[in-house]
Every structure is written in C-alpha cells, then in structure tokens.
Regions:
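Conserved alpha-helical substructure of the radical SAM core
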Residues: 1-104
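Conserved AdoMet/S-adenosylmethionine-binding subsite of the radical SAM
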Residues: 73-185, 189-191
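A structural signal for well-ordered alpha-helical scaffolds and beta->alpha junctions
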Residues: 7, 43-46, 76, 126-132, ...
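Short aromatic-enriched loop/helix-cap "lid" or pocket-rim segments at secondary-structure transitions
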Residues: 23-25, 76, 105-106, 129-130, ...
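General structural signal for secondary-structure boundaries
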Residues: 38-45, 105-106, 131, 196, ...
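Flexible, charged surface loops at secondary-structure boundaries
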Residues: 55-58, 109-111, 217-218
Length: 260
C-alpha cells in the first residue's frame, strides 16, 4: 500500500482550556451560547488519532495543533515529539495567542515547522513586542512565523446584507474548505463548522473512502445552512478583567527575553 498525502490543512484540538475568553469563539463559545465543541486530548488520545493515519498509510499536508490555547497543555512537548516521530505530517503547525511563551513552551515550539500567532485587540501590540525581542529573533530563525489578526469574528449562520446565497455559492466562497479541516478520534471533517456541529463526518473505516472524502470538491450538505461570507462582528471578550491580566502577563513574558 503506497503512502498517500491528504491535501489541505487539518486541525487537531488538544485542549478546551484557554487564557482568553473570546465572545463567539467557534470552539469555546459556539453560537455565543457558551457551548464547547472541541475535545480535551491526552497524549494517548493523540497517539490513537495518528495510529489511524499509520494504519491506512496516510499522511497530512499540514497538521495544526489547536485549543483552546495549546501551549497550556501539560503534554504539549510529548505530543509534538510523538507526531514528528511518526512521519505522518509534512508540516506541523501550532496556533497560539502568544501569551504563554515560557521557557519550557518556547523550547517545545522550536521543534515545529510553523507557528501562527493570533492577535486580538486586547493584545494587538504583541507583534511589535515579539519582533523586537530576542525571543522573536530566536524563534523566527528556526520556525516560520505567521500572524493572524482577529479584529473581527464571523457569525456563522448569519448572512451579510445584499448578497446572494445558495449551496454552491457558499461552497465556492468558503474560506474553510481547504485550511480548516479537522482530524479526531472519530474520523475526519472537511470543515471546522461541521466539526462543531458534528455533521458530515468520515469515519476511520476505509482508506479509499477517506481519500475520496477529502479530495472531493462537492459541497457538503451543511453548506446550504452556512452562508459564506458570513456576517462579521467586532471581537469582544466575555471576561475583560481576566483577559486583560493574561494579555499583560503574556506581553511581559516576551519582554523578559530581551533581558536575558
């Protein structure tokens, strides 16, 4: 059985804990209802997920480790070491808000291929502080760094005024279909929204079915209920005092690297 690489970028959610409380977070405040839609995985859970790829001799073009805030996971170092040892991922990425760059976390992050730092209004100075710090110089010399600005959140399921929507148009205009696939113990999703809704899952049953599912360019059944582009709203916090405190702590952590 020859190896096959599944195209696109796949999300692996390893924790439901975060040091920010974003209103409308797609995995921790779904539909602004407080619903948590992602898992909390141990190292053994991650091993079980990756074992399904190994069983079918499948690889991923990119795997993104997500939370919550993944740097808060106590087993993050072991999880990254294990994934890299399996040779099942061509590019290993971690998505973080950049507010927990402790010495131990930074040592772990140097093993990655790519880091995506999400920047929120409360911590918008993080790019400037990070890029001017010794930490920024050190990490960017080893790992590719991207910044994702989160001034606005999509309100999934809500239409923008003045636009036509239908199943095909929603699919064609969707930003999720290649970059926000999800892999978990149950199987694979082609979209983080269907993952949150627990719809359109391809289980770990048959290699060719998995390949056909991921390679398909046919809209999902849920696309008709998911207008794209969705209505947007300005980023807000559900807990301003805690988020401000954690943002200041995170920025100070980065600044301390300039003193080392």
């Amino acid at each position: 059985m020859l190896p096959f690489t599944l195209n696109g970028s796949f999300d692996l959610h390893i924790t439901d804990y975060c040091n920010l409380h974003c209103k409308g977070c797609v995995v921790l405040d779904y539909n602004q209802s407080g619903e948590v839609t992602n898992e909390k995985y141990t190292l053994d859970n991650v091993i079980d997920v990756i074992s399904n790829l190994k069983k079918f001799n499948l690889k991923l073009e990119e795997l993104k480790i997500l939370g919550g805030e993944p740097t808060l996971h106590t087993d993050l170092n072991q999880i990254i070491d294990y994934i890299k040892s399996t040779n099942t991922v061509e590019k290993l990425t971690l998505v973080t808000n950049g507010l927990n760059f402790t010495k131990e976390v930074v040592e772990t992050l140097t093993k990655l291929d790519r880091i995506i730092i999400s920047i929120y209004p409360m911590s918008r100075s993080i790019e400037s502080v990070f890029s001017k710090s010794k930490l920024g110089d050190m990490l960017s010399s080893k790992v590719h760094i991207d910044y994702l600005y989160q001034e606005y959140f999509f309100l999934y399921g809500y239409k923008q005024d003045g636009l036509e929507y239908n199943n095909e148009l929603n699919w064609k205009r969707c930003l999720q279909k290649n970059d926000c696939r999800v892999i978990n113990l149950d199987g694979l999703y082609r979209c983080t929204i269907t993952y949150s809704e627990k719809k359109n899952l391809c289980e770990w049953n048959n290699r060719q079915e998995i390949i056909d599912f991921i390679e398909s360019d046919i809209p999902l059944s849920h696309c008709k209920d998911c207008p794209m582009p969705a209505k947007t709203t300005k980023w807000e916090t559900n807990n301003s005092p805690i988020d401000l405190k954690n943002s200041m702590r995170g920025l100070n952590l980065i600044k301390t690297w300039s003193q080392k």
